[in-house]
Amino acid sequence: MWRRSISILRPSPTTVIPSNVLSGSQLELKPLFDNHAETTREDGSNVTTTQFQLLGDNPTLASIQVSPSIPLYVRHNSIVSIHDSDRLSNVNVSYNKWFTFWPTLSLSRFDKLVGTNTFNCLVSSRKSSDTLSVLQLNGTQDWIVLNPKSVVSFEGNSSLSIQWFHKWLNYFRWISNKVTVLRSYGKLSGRGNVLLNGNGSVYKLELKSEDDQIILQKNRILAFNGLNKLDFKQAVTFEQTSKSLESDSQPETIHNNEDKIAFMKTVNTTLEFLKTRWHTMSNTDFVRVKGPRTVLVQTDAKSSAQTWPTSTLSLKPAKNYLSFAKIDNGSVNFKNTTSLLEKK
């Protein structure tokens, strides 16, 4: 009996983004290559579970080692290969497994892989320009994921919980989690591994203290972690682009008139509600992220669309420089070949 091993290497990119970009005294930029996952039994001993390993510097492939009898869910059309198994016939792949993220109005299809023995599989990103990253949940912190389509794969153990919230479809659950800045999001909690797909390159920003803050475009945030509901509420806030002017020159009669004060409070409350709703519906707003926490940032690289001219392309007629000579009575006359066509 012989076994063949497969090695896949991705060449290093010619252009490398400097590691000091976005780095500071308290802001740390790290790659996402710590990929071994372990859980702890009740007796304190470690047991190896499903392992995710990213391949390459800007990984578009992930090698996943699946333990026996532990289901692995992979987004449809993302499985590249299944290999390194004693018996591939013992690996069951269910292609009709639908996993509905209904609170976000997104219907996603996942393939379910489960085997009686350990096997490996390769999973690819959605696009060649995207980058894969691994979230390892150990039960101490939860993660917020903004886009349900960014989830590529996850292990189906009972300790891992994935919940999706939408403002208009399950308002009370959405408001109870305190992350009111985001219109829809997913909450990952428990223990397990989740493979995410980021647009462009993905970097991990470490905000080490409460004083560390960073302003990001909202759609560039792939995921961020937190301890509890209150922590998530304070994690992300809208960035105010203008400061409200304090009207010190208001007439004293306004302060003394309770009806006008109540009216102004109602107007301010209405304006704040409309502004919050406008920010929630918009995708180009900037938000302020406060530490301490880890933020996954995606560069959102998009290929420029090919532009074609609106007018019809036409070629200029080529000039004819071909001539012929005619000898008549000792004289030589040169004429262009177009004269032959005119005679016809």
Swiss-Prot record:
GO terms for biological process: inner mitochondrial membrane organization. The keyword Disulfide bond does not apply. Pfam families: AIM24. SUPFAM superfamilies: TRAP-like. InterPro entries: AIM24, AIM24_sf, Trp_RNA-bd_attenuator-like_dom. One of its GO terms (cellular component) is mitochondrial inner membrane. The keyword Mitochondrion applies. It comes from the Eukaryota. It is found in: Mitochondrion. Residues 1-13 form a transit peptide. Its main location: mitochondrion. Belongs to the AIM24 family. This is Altered inheritance of mitochondria protein 24, mitochondrial.
